[in-house]
């Protein structure tokens, strides 16, 4: 390499060691040990690396796609119950990614449409967890959006395009990667229109959002500003094809059960002609959700065009006490395993007796928050122990039973030293 630095007036004139341009011909010259590189060469190197990565991506695409049975088996490791919803999700996700791999048309020229998913189920039944677990298993970008924060374009709040913005952020603005992603829109029931008939006044956070979501969910070329900003209008917008993105919408749909019950009731008479049902005969919310029809969702407040964009509907049932006990200890990342791992870092074992698990599940049932309420119950029960344990010596085991859950006694501490144990018992 020839020495391209020479004296010029007050100092040396520096040259790029790669392309030979002087410091006056480029915007920036970065110095290393006896070498220099200009900003243009850095950009060129980045382009070369990007091309290399693109060559690697098709190899990944050629890997075998997990079958619906394999997807369902993975969901079983993390989500308890909801067998029908898992089966529906596994088939829908498999078909979606099979369509992406083989193109939108078959060899016969048949166009394959996109099937987005609507999850209906009570709070804490596992809607969000199912979507997260799916994305993690398939190793695709995943983002969550809250429908309650969305408004029509031009109003205070988030535009629907912000959803794609978040997805791009998750994959460092790699458009090709983002187009294979999954978007989960939570609280979709909260954007139902306020009345069954179209309103004269604008409903910017209800029907207006549904209208704005239509093209995005169905498939359109969304223009997203690079690196998130409208501060630089001269920047070129990124073009993202949303027809390749899988949209999963979820909501609790409180009150939908009454709409379904009204439709399925066989007795339409009034007075003596009306059908009388006992409390035992009345169906649970979960059972009613399995009978949901598009007309029920329209009556609830979703516009027909939006329901048409979500052809796959999966209903989740309420979790009973037995299912909550299983959630506490069976999944790979079960709560009892998580807290046991935390205690293990302090050098102590954590044991939950069978009656304690039942008491926790019973409390969660009373709160009507599903599996989401389990963590808050455990946090409250273990607070004092987690506060004191780091300052204590010789504690080898902490035992939790029903009386601890009910607030009648303190957790049992077992010490490695028998003298300390005797002192603790006193």
From Swiss-Prot:
GO terms for cellular component: HslUV protease complex. ATP binds at residues 122-129. Residues 4-57 form the ClpX-type ZB domain. Pfam families: AAA_2 (PF07724), ClpB_D2-small (PF10431), zf-C4_ClpX (PF06689). This is ATP-dependent Clp protease ATP-binding subunit ClpX. ATP-dependent specificity component of the Clp protease. It directs the protease to specific substrates. Can perform chaperone functions in the absence of ClpP. GO terms for biological process: cell division; proteolysis involved in protein catabolic process. Belongs to the ClpX chaperone family. One of its GO terms (molecular function) is ATP-dependent protein folding chaperone. The keyword NADP does not apply. Keywords: ATP-binding, Chaperone, Metal-binding, Nucleotide-binding, Zinc. Zn(2+) binds at residues 16, 19, 38, 41. InterPro entries: AAA+_ATPase, ATP-dep_Clp_protease_ClpX, ATPase_AAA_core, Clp_ATPase_C, Clp_protease_ATP-bd_su_ClpX, ClpX_bact, P-loop_NTPase, Znf_CppX_C4. The keyword Metal-binding applies. Component of the ClpX-ClpP complex. Forms a hexameric ring that, in the presence of ATP, binds to fourteen ClpP subunits assembled into a disk-like structure with a central cavity, resembling the structure of eukaryotic proteasomes.
